[in-house]
């Protein structure tokens, strides 16, 4: 039952719009209990600035979950190193940001929480604090000891997963191997089944090169790597179409049949999805032993505390996590 489920939320960079969005989430009822890992004073201060009602209660492990009521939040406390001014980064709070991610992740791994929804973090501030950090996806993979996870962004109409994520373009081709494709496509296929309720997922796969290599005249990765990998996976019963040129694949005649698209690199697939659904897209990490969704935007420091931040993507991420919980329990 959803009413017996808890999800954990991290508000992200404290100087950004994450705390604003969490306060906005609290203004409506939810069918699950929302537990926010954050500094309680940060949430109180931001609610006061936004002039929105907010009652906080401290999270008590071992108690029964209660569906969320408008105007209230359950808080799993973490404490800032320095006071926060909305819109002003302070690298001293970077350890606080990572502490919230670690505690939320550990709670999901232990079964304490049914899903994790993350607000936007500021990668630059964390790295400026001397902490190597490339993103949520890699952080959770390392903490959960997963050798491979897959980044996927989704709207209501389109899901795009990535064979590679945060790599310089010059390193992409060398990272596309048969082993990589086997692992990525297997995770994508299995999570479409278990977390999205797709019994026989149909995955469309982009080529790496222009025109998918043009028969080897514009690169041989399709011939030497991608096609053999797809053929091997088809022999396992997977329904795969491709490799197709990306400028051909992202058309309605193909997308209407696709449960997901696999792009070879970050900027091959995500610009199309974000153009189609920015503000409504959700970032999902596949391959983790728990459900993780996230907003599709950044910290928007200039909007923090202004009341102008749009909680649409956060609400969509939370709603998708709830839907995935349902599918996982069926």
Swiss-Prot record:
Keywords noted in UniProt: Cobalt, Cytoplasm, Magnesium, Metal-binding, NAD, NADP, Oxidoreductase, Pyridoxine biosynthesis, Zinc
A molecular function GO annotation: NAD binding
Cell division keyword on record: no
Catalyzed reactions per annotation: 4-(phosphooxy)-L-threonine + NAD(+) = 3-amino-2-oxopropyl phosphate + CO2 + NADH
GO cellular component, one term: cytoplasm
Coiled coil: none
EC numbers, comma separated: 1.1.1.262
Residues annotated as binding a divalent metal cation: 166, 211, 266
Protein origin, superkingdom: Bacteria
Cofactor binding summary note: Binds 1 divalent metal cation per subunit. Can use ions such as Zn(2+), Mg(2+) or Co(2+).
Cofactor(s) annotated in UniProt: Zn(2+); Mg(2+); Co(2+)
Enzyme class per UniProt: oxidoreductase
Pfam families hit by this protein: PdxA (PF04166)
Main localisation: cytoplasm
Known pathway: Cofactor biosynthesis; pyridoxine 5'-phosphate biosynthesis; pyridoxine 5'-phosphate from D-erythrose 4-phosphate: step 4/5
Residues that bind substrate: 136-137, 274, 283, 292
A biological process term (GO) from this entry: pyridoxal phosphate biosynthetic process
Compartment(s): Cytoplasm
Note: The active site is located at the dimer interface.
Oligomer and partners: Homodimer.
Annotated function: Catalyzes the NAD(P)-dependent oxidation of 4-(phosphooxy)-L-threonine (HTP) into 2-amino-3-oxo-4-(phosphooxy)butyric acid which spontaneously decarboxylates to form 3-amino-2-oxopropyl phosphate (AHAP).
Family (UniProt): Belongs to the PdxA family.
Protein name: 4-hydroxythreonine-4-phosphate dehydrogenase
Native source organism of the sequence: Erwinia tasmaniensis (strain DSM 17950 / CFBP 7177 / CIP 109463 / NCPPB 4357 / Et1/99)
Primary gene name: pdxA
């Amino acid at each position: 039952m959803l009413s017996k489920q808890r999800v954990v939320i991290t508000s992200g960079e404290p100087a950004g719009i994450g705390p604003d969005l969490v306060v906005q989430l609290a203004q409506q009822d939810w069918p699950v209990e929302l537990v926010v890992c954050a500094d309680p004073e940060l949430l109180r201060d931001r609610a006061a600035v936004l002039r929105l009602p907010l009652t906080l209660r401290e999270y008590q492990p071992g108690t029964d979950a209660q569906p969320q009521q408008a105007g209230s939040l359950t808080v799993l406390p973490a404490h800032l190193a320095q006071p926060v001014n909305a819109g002003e980064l302070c690298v001293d709070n970077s350890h606080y940001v990572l502490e919230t991610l670690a505690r939320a992740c550990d709670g999901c791994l232990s079964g304490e929480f049914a899903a994790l929804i993350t607000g936007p973090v500021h990668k630059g501030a964390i790295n400026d604090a001397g902490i190597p950090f490339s993103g949520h996806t890699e952080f959770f993979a390392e903490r959960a000891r997963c050798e491979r996870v897959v980044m996927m962004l989704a709207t209501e109409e389109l899901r795009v997963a990535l064979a590679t994520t945060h790599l310089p373009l010059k390193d992409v081709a060398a990272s596309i191997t048969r082993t990589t494709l086997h692992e990525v496509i297997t995770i994508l296929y299995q999570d479409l089944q278990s977390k999205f309720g797709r019994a026989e997922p149909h995955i469309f796969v982009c080529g790496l090169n222009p025109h998918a290599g043009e028969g080897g005249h514009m690169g041989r990765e399709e011939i030497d790597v991608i096609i053999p990998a797809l053929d091997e996976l088809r022999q396992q019963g997977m329904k795969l179409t491709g490799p197709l040129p990306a400028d051909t694949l992202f058309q309605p005649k193909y997308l209407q049949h696709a449960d997901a698209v696999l792009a070879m690199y970050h900027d091959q697939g995500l610009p199309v999805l974000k153009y189609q659904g920015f503000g409504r897209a959700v970032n999902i990490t596949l391959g983790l032993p728990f459900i993780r969704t996230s907003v599709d935007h950044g910290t928007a420091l200039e909007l923090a505390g202004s009341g102008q931040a749009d909680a649409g993507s956060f609400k969509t991420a939370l709603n998708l996590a709830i839907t995935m919980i349902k599918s996982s329990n069926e």
